[in-house]
């Protein structure tokens, strides 16, 4: 192969012409980082400064890259017994406000992520002694989500904010969560939903 073959592909061979398709991309670098964790901490610091009602700063971390703020006090501060099951409503979003998941139908509709095939209702959480063993509707969750739940007690409402090492890391998740994205989860412990 040489440059002439690449620039002038055969015109009569339909099987090879697709591999010679050209594409032009116009890219703009909007931000860069020498250290991705420092970049995420700076983004979270900016979020805290732009949302002063949270009353958080980067100095308030409970663990590297993890922040929790109680929004409504619990009715009981007793720690859950291992293997207890309780129910939560939650909304997950990015620092820019993009909602990517929720158990609330109105929130889903308001943010363009509603799916008629999904049931919007509180979901069960299985408590565990070690937060990494907490399960949501029988499935494992990212560490930051589990850490947020581990801070909570009966009927409490709170928000967990954490860097990507406690979320989806470099890979992101689906089309909504890019790699290295700090995440926000607003979670409320609620009563078990009525069976229909």
Locate the predicted segments by residue.
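Cross-family detector of peptidyl-prolyl cis-trans isomerase
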Residues: 1-196
């Amino acid at each position: 192969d040489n440059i002439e073959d690449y620039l002038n592909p055969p015109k009569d061979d339909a099987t090879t012409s697709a591999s010679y398709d050209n594409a032009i991309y116009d890219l703009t670098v909007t931000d860069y980082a020498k250290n991705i964790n420092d970049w995420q901490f700076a983004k979270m610091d900016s979020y805290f400064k732009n949302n002063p009602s949270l009353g958080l700063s980067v100095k308030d971390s409970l663990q590297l890259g993890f922040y929790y703020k109680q929004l409504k006090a619990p009715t009981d501060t007793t720690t859950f017994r291992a293997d207890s099951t309780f129910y939560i409503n939650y909304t997950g979003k990015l620092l820019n406000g993009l909602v990517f998941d929720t158990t609330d139908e109105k929130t889903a509709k308001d943010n363009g992520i509603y799916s008629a095939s999904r049931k919007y209702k509180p979901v069960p959480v299985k408590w565990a002694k070690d937060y990494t063993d907490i399960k949501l509707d029988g499935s494992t969750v990212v560490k930051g989500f589990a850490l947020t739940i581990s801070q909570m007690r009966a009927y409490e409402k709170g928000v967990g904010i954490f860097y990507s090492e406690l979320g989806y890391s470099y890979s992101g998740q689906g089309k909504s969560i890019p790699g290295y994205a700090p995440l926000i989860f607003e979670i409320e412990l609620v009563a078990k939903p009525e069976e229909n």
